[in-house]
Amino acid sequence: KYGYGELWLRMAQEIEGHVKYGTDVIELDLNYSRIRMADGEYCEAEKIITTIPWNSYQHITGLPEDLHLAVKRLKHSSIETRYVGDTLQTDAQWLYIPDEQKPYHRILIRHNFCQGSRGFWLETRKERVDMYPDEAQFCYMNEYAYPLNTIDKPQIMQQLLAFTSERQVYGLGRWGEHCHYNSDVVVDLAMKLSEKICHE
């Protein structure tokens, strides 16, 4: 209790009844300031803040063709997190493994910073998961783990965010801005964005 996740649990309690869980947003309509979810339900708003990957929308209505094509050029990496129930004898919290012979590239040793934890977690790029000889006890594939920087990404995002913000749709955070932010930075950005759009 009172760990990092406690912040999000308390925030969720404050906005209970105003959040819909368990469904994907599949369409963003810039013309009518609304979203459509996978279950077919629409939600409208005066202002929309999007924090999901732009290229995860099945369709963005009202976006010019050149920006549609640009969004398709945004790149990301996918990471599998795999649990191993053994104990690693190390004082490290993270180990980085730059070894092409191993499928994983990073190990998270939770028991060194989270009391009562057992085992450790392997992080593996999606393209290397097949290198494991056996099935994992538990694993999770995060399709959108990290946004990747490409030569044209800054220009794409500048044009995209300028266009959508003129229509009261704001990209925020790691995926809304397609930038590798950690959550503490995003909380600060969210507070600043809320102050800005509340005074528009």
Task: Identify the residue ranges that each predicted region occupies.
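Short beta-strand to alpha-helix junction loop
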Residues: K1-Q13, K20
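Alpha-helical elements of Rossmann-like donor-binding domains used by nucleotide-donor carbohydrate transfer enzymes
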Residues: E6, R10, K47, Q159, ...
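Short, hydrophobic alpha-helical segments
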Residues: I15, V19, E44-E46, S194-E200
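Conserved beta-strand segments of alpha/beta enzyme cores
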Residues: H18-K20, E135-A136, Q168
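Short loop/edge segments at beta-strand edges and connector loops
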Residues: V19-T23, D29, G173
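Mid-domain catalytic core of redox enzymes
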Residues: I26-S33, M37-A145, I156-F163
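C-terminal catalytic lobe of FAD-dependent flavoproteins
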Residues: E143-E200
